[in-house]
A protein has these predicted regions:
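Extended amphipathic alpha-helical scaffold segments
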Residues: 121-170, 174-177
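Short, structured patches in soluble enzyme cores that scaffold and shape functional sites
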Residues: 24-26, 34-36, 51, 59, ...
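Charged, amphipathic alpha-helical linkers/stalks
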Residues: 69-138
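C-terminal non-catalytic accessory extensions
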Residues: 156-228
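A short hydrophobic beta-strand segment most commonly corresponding to one strand
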Residues: 17-23, 46-48, 62-80
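Conserved double-stranded beta-helix
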Residues: 1-24
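Short beta-strand His + acidic residue motifs that chelate non-heme Fe in jelly-roll/DSBH
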Residues: 4-7, 30-32, 49-50, 54-61
Length: 228
């Protein structure tokens, strides 16, 4: 069987999304580990897990596992179901071979320019997680807080003046490049308390690589066509 090494999903896609696993083909020898818990996801069940925690898969069987996975942000109805899951009875849903005609998929997954409020939320969550780690250097922690809040403030200034205007993209790039140049060489100069991930890779994936997506501009015009 194949193994999935321990890792954390920390790129931008996972800031607001979770993944539902529906095992189609599996074996009792397949175990999924998340944090300090482990479980066998049986065929036909539906599972949700916290991808911010360290997780891995161990397949000691000769069976290749096949899962249907669905990534979504989720409506209030979805999250209400998640909250109440332990109190609800399991429902067996019979297979229906009829074509699905009303399957809804995301059409606007990423904005051309990250909204300042979203950037601030990501920054504050990451800083709080690192500040909760007593092993981090307080002076470096202070420097990173100033660096990331400077990024947010300058980003908000350009956003307030120009929004999605392509004429402002050079200014946005300059802000991102300046921030990237001031990151410490050590990717683990600060480490999160919750899952022991270095701060730099998270900054790179959740902010610097995600904050400016010029090719998405057309999608936000009245005649826009979503990109693949």
């Amino acid at each position: 069987g194949a193994q999935v090494a321990e890792h954390v999903d920390f790129n931008y896609h996972w800031v607001s999304r979770v993944r539902i696993h529906v095992p189609i083909i599996t074996d009792p020898g397949v175990l999924f580990y998340c944090g300090d818990e482990s479980v066998h996801m049986a065929e036909g069940e539906s599972w949700l897990f916290d991808s911010w925690r360290r997780h891995r898969v161990v397949n000691d069987s000769s069976v290749s596992r096949v899962h249907l996975v669905i990534d979504l942000a989720g409506s209030s109805r979805f999250w209400r179901t998640v909250r109440e899951a332990s109190e609800l009875e399991a429902i067996d849903v019979p297979f229906d071979e009829s074509p699905i005609s009303n399957l809804r998929t995301e059409q606007f997954p990423v904005a051309p320019v990250m909204a300042p409020g979203e950037m601030l939320a990501i920054v504050e969550q990451l800083l709080s997680d690192c500040e909760a780690n007593p092993d981090n250097n307080p002076e470096i922690m202070k420097r990173y807080r100033h660096l990331l809040l400077d990024l947010v403030h300058d980003w908000r200034e350009i956003w307030s003046l120009h929004g999605f205007a392509e004429t402002a993209f050079a200014h946005y790039r300059q802000i991102l490049q300046r921030t990237a140049s001031q990151l410490a060489p050590d990717p683990r100069v600060l480490v999160t308390s919750s899952n022991k991930v270095g701060i730099n890779p998270v900054i790179n994936q959740r902010i610097l690589a995600a904050a400016l997506r010029p090719r998405r501009v057309a999608e936000f015009s009245p005649a826009g066509t979503p990109a693949a």
